[in-house]
Amino acid sequence: LRRSQILSGDILFTISGATVGKIALVKEEIIPANTNQALAIIRSNKETLRPQFLYHWLKTRIIKNIVDKNQTVGAQPNVSLSQIGELPVPSISLEIQDQICKLLDSIDQVTSSIRKKIIHLKYLRKSLMSDLLSGRTRVTI
């Protein structure tokens, strides 16, 4: 059970199933928690590699291509723990990592906000279409 315990800052990497390669950064609010065998726990040395930077790096197209190329496909797609351990990670100063994370985090916030607005606009469109088609709302031309 100890090997399956996750800590804040860990990265969870799906290694089995239809979602191979999906990742998540563990936040303090979900601790204590454990994983199952379909997830790899990636724990960085925080003195040389920021978890947030590693998270952003593992989301890149470069890593996705490597994972897609190396997964074995049987009943379910799989990636081995040794393959995860062999993924390349850039060696960049903590200062540069922090700058990159700040930029990417702000882009993620804007993207999330836009997605929420799109969902809301689709809901409004659906409501308006329903009102127009049912005759509850009339349009004068």
What spans do the regions from the language model cover?
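A short glycine-rich beta-alpha junction/loop motif
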Residues: P32-A40, R50-Q52, T72-E95
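Periplasmic-binding protein-like
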Residues: I63-V67
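Short amphipathic beta-strand starts and helix->beta connectors
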Residues: L25-K27, K69-V73
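Residue-level recognition of specific faces of alpha-helices
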Residues: K22, A38-I41, N78, Q83, ...
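Amphipathic alpha-helical coiled-coil/heptad-repeat segments
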Residues: S91-I141
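ATP/adenylate-binding site constellation spanning eukaryotic-like Ser/Thr protein kinases
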Residues: G17, T60, L81-I84, K126
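A short beta-sheet element
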Residues: L1-K59
